[in-house]
C-alpha cells in the first residue's frame, strides 16, 4: 500500500483505468464472437452488420491504445475474410 499522496492517487487512477480498459476489451471480444457465431450459422446479413460493429469496437480499442494497430488490422482482416467466404 503506497504511503505517498501522489502514489495513492496513481494507484486509484490505475485501478479506474484498468476497469475502463477491461470493459472496452470485453466489448471488442464480444463483438468479434458475434461475427464468428453469425458466420458459423451461415447468416450472411447478420454477419455483415456484426462485422461493422466489431470493426467499430476494434478501432476504438486502437484509438485508446489497448490494441496495436497491426493487431487490429489482422483481426478485421480475418473477420472480413470469414464474412466474405459466406457470400462466395
From Swiss-Prot:
Gene3D superfamilies (UniProt xref): Ribosomal protein S20 (1.20.58.110)
Region (Disordered): 1-20
GO terms under cellular component: cytosol; small ribosomal subunit
Presence of the UniProt keyword Ribosomal protein in the record: yes
Pfam families: Ribosomal_S20p
Disulfide cysteine pairs (residue numbers): none
Methyltransferase recorded as keyword: no
GO molecular function terms listed in the Swiss-Prot or TrEMBL record: small ribosomal subunit rRNA binding; structural constituent of ribosome
Keywords: Ribonucleoprotein, Ribosomal protein, RNA-binding, rRNA-binding
SUPFAM superfamilies noted in UniProt: Ribosomal protein S20 (SSF46992)
One Gene Ontology biological process: translation
Residues that span the membrane, as ranges: none
InterPro entries for this protein: Ribosomal_bS20, Ribosomal_bS20_sf
Functional summary from the UniProt entry: Binds directly to 16S ribosomal RNA.
Similarity-based family: Belongs to the bacterial ribosomal protein bS20 family.
Protein name: Small ribosomal subunit protein bS20
Amino acid at each position: 500500500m503506497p504511503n505517498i499522496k501522489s502514489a495513492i492517487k496513481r494507484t486509484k487512477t490505475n485501478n479506474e483505468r484498468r476497469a475502463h480498459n477491461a470493459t472496452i476489451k470485453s466489448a471488442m471480444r464480444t463483438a468479434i464472437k458475434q461475427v464468428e457465431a453469425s458466420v458459423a450459422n451461415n447468416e450472411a446479413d447478420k454477419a455483415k452488420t456484426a462485422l461493422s460493429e466489431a470493426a467499430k469496437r476494434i478501432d476504438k480499442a486502437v484509438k485508446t491504445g489497448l490494441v496495436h494497430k497491426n493487431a487490429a488490422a489482422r483481426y478485421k482482416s480475418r473477420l472480413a475474410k470469414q464474412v466474405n467466404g459466406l457470400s462466395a
